[in-house]
């Protein structure tokens, strides 16, 4: 007995058997088999080998293998010599190339495979990895060229410096534009550059530099596209973004004053609390505001000595007379291993930055910036890592910015009530504390877009806590228009305050957490602010990177966040638990040491059952915590 020259009917019959053998749960597989059977019935021509079915739409290698098994069993039962069909790998290798593969690339690939693979391994060809080359005028292309232009090879540069230069090399905006709903900028291409080892990221705040492969590729792109950098053949000037750490020597307050020929300045006792005193007065009364400002001006003029004169220059430095003041603003020194710059008063301008989410309404998103502009007050809008309004100082020579010691958190009454209810209020309060800003304001707008329910007492308690216990200041306004008036009045005070101050701007290179951010700031304040006339602050880039919600969590912060995932655990309860059990491992070990399940369920209750106020743990909550951690 021999097989027919056309086994189409047998294949259709076996496909039906495959359909009948499926369970009700294999609905998708049933649809695939029925589709294959239907297409085979409508197909023209003869089908002898199972591999001949490959040309039928809906029949792939899996179905062919199952039909091949059935054909072999059929031949065995009927004592027919088995069909020697060509292998699937040989069949697939003879198929025409895909549309996306050019004929030239197919020839090259086949030649390489013939050279590198043994004959028996031709069926398992390895896909060759292509070298990553960013598309012309793309984000990655612009970042590479800007890094090369900034000479970011021996030392890295910041994200802001890259973005400032990269715009001319890209067809896309490097930063998000929230007003046009462009939530992602071309800067996101940095991830691909790091993945392919073209750019190196290091330090906190982050610094970016080119690797050897990155330098080679970028120079090739520059040559291929005929790009020339503006100052390619010039010597690096005094404002060069890449600085040599070896030229930075250690200088404390005494050394700094000796270098600039300054005398020891008496401490201005009233100067620290001046801004806080102004806050609680009627800021909407210009005459009263001016009287206080110029009264403070007279006090300062009697005690402070001008910081603009540079009387002595070391022998190894040659500074032109016309550039004395500008040169002094960019000298970088070190204290406790941290770099800093001295900005003399008059060498920087002060203005507020408003968070892009601070709007009057959905239809009037730029209300505050336009209102400040009408009052002749410069402002910027960008995404802030912390706070709704911060004041910055921008160096007129270098363009670098630093965060001043004033931050405002704006809340409507209904938003404040919601933030208390979902624990955002305490979380924001803690982050504001870690910012190190001396003047922290809660600006409360007494307008509501919703009902606050039974939150009156909670609102009073929360506001009293931040005013009395945490020493925050509060500004109350009736609406957005009055908010503009109060912010403008506060800006007047801040601008005058810093018109007679020199700034020590800190440039740390390796901060691990928000606690380190504040620790470094306090160290500088203890050294440089003890004689008055100088104020210390971090650069804006450092503030933006370290004060965000999601980055640089310590083990303790992670423990608190995990504990708050248990329903019923507020921030206060989580902090109380973390003080006793510093890490999650300590919690797990505490449950393992319990002698019985009943003891484990009451572990947290026995520890914090008598804790005061919001830190108290009830028996039911203690059992919930056991269910989450005690059964692991």
From Swiss-Prot:
Similarity annotation: Belongs to the XPF family.
Gene Ontology BP, a term: double-strand break repair via break-induced replication
Location within or outside the cell: Nucleus
GO cellular component, one term: nucleus
Keyword Calcium assigned: no
Superkingdom in the source lineage: Eukaryota
Species name: Saccharomyces cerevisiae (strain ATCC 204508 / S288c) (Baker's yeast)
Cofactor(s) listed in the protein's UniProt record: Mg(2+); Mn(2+)
Biased composition (Basic and acidic residues): 112-123
Keywords, alphabetical: DNA damage, DNA recombination, DNA repair, Endonuclease, Hydrolase, Magnesium, Manganese, Meiosis, Metal-binding, Nuclease, Nucleus
Protein name per UniProt: Crossover junction endonuclease MUS81
CDD domains attached to this UniProt entry: WH_MUS81, XPF_nuclease_Mus81
SMART domains, per the entry: ERCC4
PANTHER family hit by this protein: CLASS II CROSSOVER JUNCTION ENDONUCLEASE MUS81, CROSSOVER JUNCTION ENDONUCLEASE MUS81
Function field: Interacts with MMS4 to form a DNA structure-specific endonuclease with substrate preference for branched DNA structures with a 5'-end at the branch nick. Typical substrates include 3'-flap structures, D-loops, replication forks with regressed leading strands and nicked Holliday junctions. Cleavage probably occurs approximately half a helical turn upstream of the free 5'-end in these structures.
Region entry Interaction with MMS4, spans: 527-632
Region listing for Disordered, in residue ranges: 109-129
InterPro entries, per database record: DNA_pol_lamdba_lyase_dom_sf, EME1/EME2_C, ERCC4_domain, Mus81, Restrct_endonuc-II-like, WH-like_DNA-bd_sf, WH_MUS81, XPF_nuclease_Mus81
Note from the entry: Two distinct classes of meiotic crossovers have been demonstrated in budding yeast. Class I crossovers exhibit crossover interference and require MSH4 and MSH5 for their resolution, while class II crossovers exhibit no crossover interference and require MUS81 and MMS4. While class I crossovers represent the majority of crossovers in S.cerevisiae, they are virtually absent in S.pombe, which lacks orthologs of MSH4 and MSH5.
Signal peptide: none
Assembly behavior: Interacts with MMS4 and RAD54.
């Amino acid at each position: 007995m021999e097989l027919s020259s056309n086994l189409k009917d047998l294949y259709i019959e076996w496909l039906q058997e495959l359909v009948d053998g499926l369970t009700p749960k294999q609905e998708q597989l049933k649809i695939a088999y029925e589709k294959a059977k239907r297409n085979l019935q409508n197909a023209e021509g003869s089908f002898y080998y199972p591999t001949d079915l490959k040309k039928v739409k809906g029949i792939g290698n899996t179905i062919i293998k199952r039909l091949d098994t059935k054909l072999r069993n059929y031949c065995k039962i009927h004592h027919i010599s088995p069909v020697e069909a060509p292998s699937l790998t040989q069949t697939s290798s003879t198929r025409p190339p895909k549309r996306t593969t050019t004929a030239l690339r197919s020839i090259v690939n086949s030649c390489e495979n013939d050279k590198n693979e043994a004959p028996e391994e031709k069926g398992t060809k390895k896909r060759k990895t292509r070298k990553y080359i960013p598309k012309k005028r793309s984000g990655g292309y612009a970042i590479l060229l800007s890094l090369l232009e900034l000479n970011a090879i021996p030392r890295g540069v910041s994200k802001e410096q890259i973005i400032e230069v990269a715009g001319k090399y890209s067809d896309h905006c490097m930063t998000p534009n929230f007003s046009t709903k462009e939530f992602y900028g071309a800067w996101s291409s940095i991830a691909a550059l790091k993945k392919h080892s073209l750019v190196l990221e290091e330090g906190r705040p982050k610094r970016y530099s080119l690797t050897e492969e990155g330098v080679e590729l970028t120079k090739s792109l520059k040559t291929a596209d005929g790009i020339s950098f503006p100052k390619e053949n010039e010597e690096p000037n005094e404002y060069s973004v890449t600085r040599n750490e070896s030229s930075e020597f250690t200088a404390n307050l005494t050394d700094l004053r000796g270098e600039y020929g300054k005398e020891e300045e008496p401490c201005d006792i009233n100067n620290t609390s001046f801004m806080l005193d102004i806050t609680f007065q009627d800021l909407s009364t210009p005459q009263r505001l001016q009287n206080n400002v110029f009264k403070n001006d007279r006090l300062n003029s009697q005690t402070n000595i001008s910081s603009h004169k540079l009387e002595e220059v070391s022998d190894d430095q040659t500074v032109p007379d016309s550039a004395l003041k500008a040169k002094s603003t960019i000298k970088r020194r070190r204290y406790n291993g941290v770099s800093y710059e001295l900005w003399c008063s008059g060498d920087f301008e002060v203005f507020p930055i408003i968070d892009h989410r601070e709007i009057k309404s959905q239809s009037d998103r730029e209300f505050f910036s336009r209102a400040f502009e009408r009052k002749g007050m410069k402002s910027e809008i960008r995404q802030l890592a912390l706070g709704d309004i911060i004041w910055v100082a921008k160096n007129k020579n270098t363009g670098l910015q630093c965060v001043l010691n004033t931050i405002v958190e704006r809340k409507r009454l209904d938003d404040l009530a919601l933030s208390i209810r979902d624990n955002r209020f305490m979380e924001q309060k803690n982050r504001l504390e870690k910012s190190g800003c001396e003047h922290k304001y809660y600006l409360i707008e007494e307008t509501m877009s919703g009902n606050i329910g039974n939150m009156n007492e909670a609102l009073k308690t929360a506001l009293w806590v931040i005013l009395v216990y945490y020493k925050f200041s509060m500004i109350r306004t009736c609406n957005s228009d009055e908010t503009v008036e109060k912010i403008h009045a506060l800006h007047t005070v801040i601008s005058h305050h810093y018109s007679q101050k020199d700034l020590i701007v800190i440039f740390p290179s390796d901060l691990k957490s928000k606690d380190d951010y504040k620790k470094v700031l306090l160290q500088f304040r203890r050294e440089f602010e003890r004689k008055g006339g100088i104020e210390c602050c971090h650069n804006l880039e450092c503030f933006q990177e370290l004060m965000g919600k999601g980055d640089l969590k310590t083990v303790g912060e992670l423990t608190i966040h995990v504990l708050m995932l248990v329903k019923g655990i507020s921030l206060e309860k989580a902090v109380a638990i973390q003080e006793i059990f510093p890490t999650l491992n300590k919690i797990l070990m505490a449950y393992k040491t319990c002698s019985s399940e009943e003891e484990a369920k009451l572990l947290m209750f026995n520890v914090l059952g008598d804790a005061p106020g919001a830190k108290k743990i009830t028996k039911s909550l203690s059992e919930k915590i056991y269910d989450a951690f005690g059964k692991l």
